[in-house]
Amino acid sequence: MARKMLVDGEIDKVAADEANATHYDFDLFVIGAGSGGVRAARFSANHGAKVGICELPFHPISSEEIGGVGGTCVIRGCVPKKILVYGATYGGELEDAKNYGWEINEKVDFTWKKLLQKKTDEILRLNNIYKRLLANAAVKLYEGEGRVVGPNEVEVRQIDGTKISYTAKHILIATGSRAQKPNIPGHELAITSDEALSLEEFPKRAIVLGGGYIAVEFASIWRGMGATVDLFFRKELPLRGFDDEMRALVARNLEGRGVNLHPQTSLTQLTKTDQGIKVISSHGEEFVADVVLFATGRSPNTKRLNLEAVGVELDQAGAVKVDEYSRTNIPSIWAVGDATNRINLTPVALMEATCFANTAFGGKPTKAEYSNVACAVFCIPPLAVVGLSEEEAVEQATGDILVFTSGFNPMKNTISGRQEKTLMKLIVDEKSDKVIGASMCGPDAAEIMQGIAIALKCGATKAQFDSTVGIHPSSAEEFVTMRSVTRRIAHKPKPKTNL
Amino acid sequence: MTMFRSISMVMLLVALVTFISMVSSAASSPEADFVKKTISSHKIVIFSKSYCPYCKKAKSVFRELDQVPYVVELDEREDGWSIQTALGEIVGRRTVPQVFINGKHLGGSDDTVDAYESGELAKLLGVSGNKEAEL
C-alpha cells in the first residue's frame, strides 16, 4: 500500500499503521463496564470499532473480585441511593400532609425490607438493560477480572479461574473507584456505602463518620426513616469544597430534622458489645450504634490492573495519569472516570467516554470540558450547585464580585408549618456581568439547577437572568428576580513577589 | 346515648391526663428546668454553638445594638445534647441559635435579623436601633 505523504513531507502515521497493519482481536478492549466503560464501548462500536469489554461478576456489594455491569452508579451508588432518598422523604411528607387536610389515623409503619427488595429489583433490571445495550451495539462482553499485560494485550481471568488473553489496538481503563475505610482500631466493625445500601436490618441507631456528600446523604436517609443518627466530621461544617453559606444551611437543616452533628470530631475506636457497636470519639465520648458507616473517601480501582508493570504512570493515590484526551503515557492505553480521579461524577465519566470515542475512533479529537459541571447532594432537602462557590470566585477574581442571595420559607412550608428555609445564590463577575456561580439548597434544587447549568454554559449574564420572566408560583423564579446585591466583594490584587 | 357520652368523657379525661403528664415530664427534666431558669434570669439569652455561622450572625446583631447577651454554647457543655432536646420540646425547633428576650422566645437567626431590621428588636430591648441617630 502506497504511503501517503503530508504537505510537510512527514509520513502520515495512520497510513503507515495501515501499511504495517498488525492484526488485533479488537480495535478496543475496555476494562470495566460501569458508566464510562459502557458509554465508551458503545460509542466506539457505533464509530465502527470492534469492541470487547470485561466486568467482574454482579453483586450489590463490591470487592476486588465482585462488580457487575452498570458499575458503582447503577448497582451501589447514585441509583440505589436516590431510591432510598425518595423512600426517606416520605416520612417528612406525611408529617407535612396533616396541615394540608390529610388525616392519617392509623399508625404509619416503615418496612425497610420492602424498600430494599424493590431497590434490588430495580438495580437488577438496570444491570440487564446495560448488558442489552452492549449486545445491541455488538460489543462482546466477558465476565471476569481484566488486567493489562502489554501495551496492546489484556488478560481476563474468568469465573472458573481460566485466563484468556486478547489483543487490542487500544485499551481503555474504566475500573472506577471503591469506598475506603480509615485505619481506626475496630474498623472491621464499620461498613461502607456499599453495605449501607444493602443492610439486612434497618439500623435504629446509626453513626456516620465523614463530612462529604455520601456521609450527609446517608445521615439524611436514615434519619428520614426514623433512625437516631450521629454525624461526625473533621471540619466545622460538612461538605468541604462547597459554598460556605450553603454548607451552613445544610448543617442547620440536618440538625433541624434531628441529626446530631459532631463537628471537629473523629472516631478513635470501635468495639463490639452486647448493646451494639461502641464508638469512642476524639473528645472521649462514648456512643453505641447498630451500624457505623465510614464515608471518608474513595480510591481508584487500579491496584490489580498490573499497570505499573506495563509502564503506565499512576499518581500517589493510585489514579491513572492522563492527558486532556484521557490518554496515558502509553499511547495505546487510555483511561476515563473515577479511575483517573478528575471529577468523580457519573455524567463526567460519560462525557470523558464520549470524548474518548470521538478521539480514538470518530476522527474528531475532543477534549473533555470541566467548566460549569453541575452537581447535587441528595440530602433532605437537597443542595445543588454549578460554577464557582463564593469562596472560589473570590480566590479566582480579577475584579469585583457581586453576590445575590434569596432566602425564604417555601410556599409549601407556610401551610405545613415546617421551619426550613430555602437559600438560592448567584455569583456575578461585575466587570462582564456574567453569572459565574449558582447554588441552591431546598426542595427540587437538583431539578432546578440543571436548567441554570445550561445558562452558565452559554455564558449568561445577570441582565439576561433578570430579563427572563419567572414561572409563578415556584421557587425557581427566585433565580430571575434577585434584583438587589446582597454584598459586593472588592477585588484584592495578590501581592507581587520576586520568587 | 348517655352511656356513650360518659365513655367519651372518660376517654377525653384519660387523653387529657396523658397529655398533661407528657407535657409536665417534658417540661420538668433538669435540662428543661435549666432552660427556663436561664431565660428568666437574663434579659437576652442565646442558645448557641460556638462554630455555627447562624449563631455568629445572631450574636453580631446584639453587638450592633451594644447589648451583651447571655450565651449558652451547647457544644461546649457535657449536657449540651440534652439541653438542645429540651429546648426543641419547648420552642418546637431543634436548630440553633434560639434567642430569648425578657423570657420570651424571639426565634432563630433569621427571626433575630428580621426583628433587628424592622426595629422591633430595639423596641423590645428599649434601646435606640440606629447608632447614627445617637451621634
From Swiss-Prot, chain A:
The keyword rRNA-binding does not apply. Keywords: Cytoplasm, Disulfide bond, FAD, Flavoprotein, NADP, Oxidoreductase, Redox-active center. It is found in: Cytoplasm. InterPro entries: FAD/NAD-bd_sf, FAD/NAD-binding_dom, FAD/NAD-linked_Rdtase_dimer_sf, GSHR, GSHR/TRXR-like, Pyr_nuc-diS_OxRdtase, Pyr_nucl-diS_OxRdtase_dimer, Pyr_OxRdtase_I_AS. Homodimer. The active site is a redox-active disulfide bond. This is Glutathione reductase, cytosolic. It comes from Arabidopsis thaliana (Mouse-ear cress).
Swiss-Prot record, chain B:
Signal peptide: none annotated. SUPFAM superfamilies: Thioredoxin-like. Disulfide bonds join C52-C55. It is found in: Cytoplasm. The keyword rRNA processing does not apply. Coiled coil: none annotated. Keywords: Cytoplasm, Disulfide bond, Electron transport, Redox-active center, Transport. Residues 32-132 form the Glutaredoxin domain. Its main location: cytoplasm. InterPro entries: GLR_AS, Glutaredoxin, Glutaredoxin_euk/vir, Glutaredoxin_subgr, Thioredoxin-like_sf. It holds the Pfam family Glutaredoxin. It comes from the Eukaryota. PROSITE patterns: GLUTAREDOXIN_1 (PS00195), GLUTAREDOXIN_2 (PS51354). One of its GO terms (cellular component) is endoplasmic reticulum. Belongs to the glutaredoxin family. CPYC subfamily. Has a glutathione-disulfide oxidoreductase activity in the presence of NADPH and glutathione reductase. Reduces low molecular weight disulfides and proteins. This is Glutaredoxin-C4. The lineage of its organism: Eukaryota, Viridiplantae, Streptophyta, Embryophyta, Tracheophyta. The gene is GRXC4.
